[in-house]
């Protein structure tokens, strides 16, 4: 069978309704990892749903208990061929955020796949059940087309805690490094830059969360009796934040800013257009770092945002000076940032500017920033394959704007990482009415079928060329 016939077989599979049935069954699992009572259903998704599907494709498997107590389990699976020229590792997560059942529009439920025209609604359709279902369906079609022989091994890690911060994932990758060893990582999560343009991203921005707090005194005091005599925690905290990021969103603390954007990065991002969709918010052109394009701000720069700010009782304000104020903040940061010292930079800045009373707590980096070299041979291979299938020039992003546990694969396992997202920016991911688009889903199935077919045809050559290039570069440094 040819590449084209394999892709057509995938189209036939989609139109038969089998894909829809599989996804509907998976959406029905209430796999809310942020719900402490979800342990049994998290395990059931793996044992009752995913393991039978993978066994049918010739995989053997391990269920791995999370090294972090009380958190979701992992499924490690592999399909090995005796004379395989390379090994592919892929990933997905079967957990979802909370359903927020009562907030969905009339006629919808987070635990039921509902088709409404081009939109298919259900929790996990976009993040991530729909995406790993697409990839496994494409793998099944390529296996059938090639009579069960790919010429490469396939390994899979499915976690059930990504929406809870991926607890234990890095530890499992380290413990099972040999079991998970591979030549290439391809997975899917997050949105394309737009529904109409297939996307390939090479890593993700990191996430650094922290809370700033002012505890001035016990209890509130009447503003008529004490106003002008007692410091106001809300005002103190507002001014502390204003010294860290200006009124237009520009980061003012030098240690929190990234390195200058390289010429290579600017070239890659030059053709990336953001926003403009029917449901996209209007971009504020004057917000963020001056002199950067929208794409450079999102994919090549750091941001500092206030997520929540509370002082007093906003719902029942009183004529009293509040005793405390706190702000939950976070940063999205790119490779090259001094993330290990973000906390120290913030503390020093506050102290140097007279804000010793502002306490920083719960400072933690959930995801590290990662980025595959855009000149890596796998990048051009992936872009060409996606473009060939879709007929649209694939957008290549140096990193995803959001956070992903990519460091587990790129750093702990040492793999080149390619992410091919299948949702789109307005998919209501993490919100009520989450959905995917049927036409984008079909295109994604075709893209992944082509990609996995091309890996069988060209993967061994890429592995060989990369090895030769690395040897040459090593010799030059000696």
Language-model regions: role of each:
Residues 94-95, 244-248, 347-356:
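A common structural junction motif
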Residues 85-155, 178, 443:
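Active-site metal-coordination/substrate-binding segment of hydrolases
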Residues 151-232:
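Histidine/acidic-residue-rich, glycine-tolerant segments that coordinate divalent metal ions
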Residues 2-101, 324-326:
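N-terminal helical capping/dimerization or prosegment-like subdomains
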Residues 15, 104-105, 147-148, 201-207, ...:
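Short glycine/proline-enriched loop/turn "hinge" motifs that connect secondary-structure elements
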Residues 83-85, 194-195, 251-316, 320-324, ...:
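An extended, acidic, His-containing surface patch that forms the Zn2+-binding/catalytic region
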Residues 227-248:
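A short core secondary-structure module
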């Amino acid at each position: 069978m040819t590449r084209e016939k394999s892709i057509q077989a995938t189209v036939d599979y989609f139109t038969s309704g089998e894909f829809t049935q599989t996804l509907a069954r998976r959406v029905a699992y209430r796999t809310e990892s942020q719900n402490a009572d979800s342990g049994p259903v998290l395990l059931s998704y793996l044992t009752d749903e995913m393991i039978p599907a993978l066994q049918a494709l010739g995989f053997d498997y391990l269920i791995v208990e999370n090294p972090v107590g009380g958190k979701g389990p992992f499924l490690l699976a592999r399909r090995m061929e005796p004379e395989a020229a390379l090994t592919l590792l892929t990933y997905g997560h079967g957990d979802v955020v909370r359903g927020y059942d009562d907030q969905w529009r009339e006629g919808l439920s987070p635990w039921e796949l509902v088709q409404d025209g081009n939109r298919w609604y259900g929790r996990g359709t976009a993040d991530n059940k729909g995406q790993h279902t697409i990839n496994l369906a494409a793998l099944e079609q390529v296996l059938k087309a090639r009579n069960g022989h790919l010429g490469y091994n396939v390994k899979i890690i499915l976690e059930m805690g990504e929406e809870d911060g991926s607890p234990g994932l890095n530890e499992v990758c380290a413990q099972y490094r040999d079991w998970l060893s591979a030549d290439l990582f391809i997975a899917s999560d997050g949105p394309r830059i737009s529904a109409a343009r297939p996307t390939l991203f090479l890593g993700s921005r990191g996430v650094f969360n922290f809370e700033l707090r002012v505890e001035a005194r016990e209890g509130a005091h009447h503003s008529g009796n004490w106003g002008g005599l007692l410091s106001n925690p809300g005002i103190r905290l507002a001014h502390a934040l204003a010294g860290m990021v200006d009124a237009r969103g520009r980061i003012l603390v030098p240690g929190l800013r990234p390195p200058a954007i390289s010429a290579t990065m600017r070239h890659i991002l030059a053709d990336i257009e953001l926003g403009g969709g029917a449901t996209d918010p209007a971009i504020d052109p004057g917000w963020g770092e001056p002199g950067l394009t929208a794409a450079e701000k999102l994919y090549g720069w750091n941001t500092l945002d206030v997520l929540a700010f509370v002082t007093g009782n906003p719902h029942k304000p009183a004529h009293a000076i509040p005793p405390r104020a706190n702000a939950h903040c976070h940063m999205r940061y790119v490779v090259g940032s001094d993330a290990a010292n973000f906390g120290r930079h913030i503390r020093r800045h506050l102290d140097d500017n007279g804000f010793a009373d502002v306490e920083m707590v719960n400072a933690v980096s959930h995801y590290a920033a990662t980025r595959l070299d855009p000149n890596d041979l796998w990048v051009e291979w992936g872009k060409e394959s996606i473009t060939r299938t879709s007929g649209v020039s694939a957008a290549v992003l140096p990193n995803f704007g959001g956070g992903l546990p990519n460091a587990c694969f790129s750093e702990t396992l040492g793999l080149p990482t390619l992410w091919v997202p299948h949702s789109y920016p307005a998919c209501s991911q993490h919100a009520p009415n989450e959905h995917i688009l049927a036409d984008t889903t079909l295109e994604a199935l075709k893209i992944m079928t082509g990609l996995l077919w091309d890996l069988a045809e060209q993967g061994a050559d890429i592995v060989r060329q990369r090895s030769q290039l690395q040897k040459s570069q090593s010799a030059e440094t000696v």
